[in-house]
């Protein structure tokens, strides 16, 4: 099977799960930036956990395709970087520079922590 197909199937699943999470949490009337933070944190954690477990798949014939499926396809599509950037840009246009900076710092920091925590859990 083509590598592109593995990435594509993972992306379809990731995008649909992102849509479902956004839809379900959107009913709670949370701030849009906070929703994006939750989804991106979940994706960062999942990617970290997956990458820490990759070594177990090395002996599997399709290990490279699994990496493509999950890391680029699924988790790449699940995260919402473009929405994150749009929110930052929108805050800057509204001259809410402190809120934009706060959103940037919190989102990147929590994303790195979630990724590292996923890596840590996968090695335990």
UniProtKB/Swiss-Prot annotation:
<keyword id="KW-0479">Metal-binding</keyword>
<keyword id="KW-0813">Transport</keyword>
<feature type="binding site">
    <location>
        <position position="79"/>
    </location>
    <ligand>
        <name>Na(+)</name>
    </ligand>
</feature>
<keyword id="KW-1133">Transmembrane helix</keyword>
<keyword id="KW-0406">Ion transport</keyword>
<protein>
    <recommendedName>
        <fullName>Fluoride-specific ion channel FluC 2</fullName>
    </recommendedName>
</protein>
<comment type="similarity">
    <text>Belongs to the fluoride channel Fluc/FEX (TC 1.A.43) family.</text>
</comment>
<dbReference type="GO" id="GO:0005886">
    <property type="term" value="C:plasma membrane"/>
</dbReference>
<keyword id="KW-1003">Cell membrane</keyword>
<feature type="transmembrane region" description="Helical">
    <location>
        <begin position="66"/>
        <end position="86"/>
    </location>
</feature>
<dbReference type="Pfam" id="PF02537">
    <property type="entry name" value="CRCB"/>
</dbReference>
<keyword id="KW-0812">Transmembrane</keyword>
<dbReference type="GO" id="GO:0046872">
    <property type="term" value="F:metal ion binding"/>
</dbReference>
<keyword id="KW-0997">Cell inner membrane</keyword>
<keyword id="KW-0472">Membrane</keyword>
<keyword id="KW-0407">Ion channel</keyword>
<keyword id="KW-0915">Sodium</keyword>
<feature type="transmembrane region" description="Helical">
    <location>
        <begin position="1"/>
        <end position="21"/>
    </location>
</feature>
<feature type="transmembrane region" description="Helical">
    <location>
        <begin position="103"/>
        <end position="123"/>
    </location>
</feature>
<dbReference type="InterPro" id="IPR003691">
    <property type="entry name" value="FluC"/>
</dbReference>
<feature type="binding site">
    <location>
        <position position="76"/>
    </location>
    <ligand>
        <name>Na(+)</name>
    </ligand>
</feature>
<dbReference type="GO" id="GO:0062054">
    <property type="term" value="F:fluoride channel activity"/>
</dbReference>
<feature type="transmembrane region" description="Helical">
    <location>
        <begin position="34"/>
        <end position="54"/>
    </location>
</feature>
<dbReference type="GO" id="GO:0140114">
    <property type="term" value="P:cellular detoxification of fluoride"/>
</dbReference>
<comment type="function">
    <text>Fluoride-specific ion channel. Important for reducing fluoride concentration in the cell, thus reducing its toxicity.</text>
</comment>
């Amino acid at each position: 099977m083509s590598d592109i197909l593995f990435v594509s199937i993972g992306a379809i699943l990731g995008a649909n799960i992102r849509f479902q999470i956004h839809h379900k949490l959107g009913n709670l009337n949370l701030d849009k930036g906070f929703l994006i933070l939750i989804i991106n944190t979940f994706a960062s954690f999942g990617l970290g956990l997956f990458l820490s477990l990759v070594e177990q798949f090395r002996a599997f014939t399709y290990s490279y395709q699994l990496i493509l499926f999950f890391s680029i396809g699924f988790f790449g599509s699940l995260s919402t970087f473009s929405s994150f950037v749009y929110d930052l840009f929108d805050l800057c246009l509204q001259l809410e520079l402190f809120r934009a900076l706060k959103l940037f710092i919190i989102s990147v920091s929590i994303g790195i922590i979630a990724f590292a925590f996923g890596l840590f859990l996968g090695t335990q």
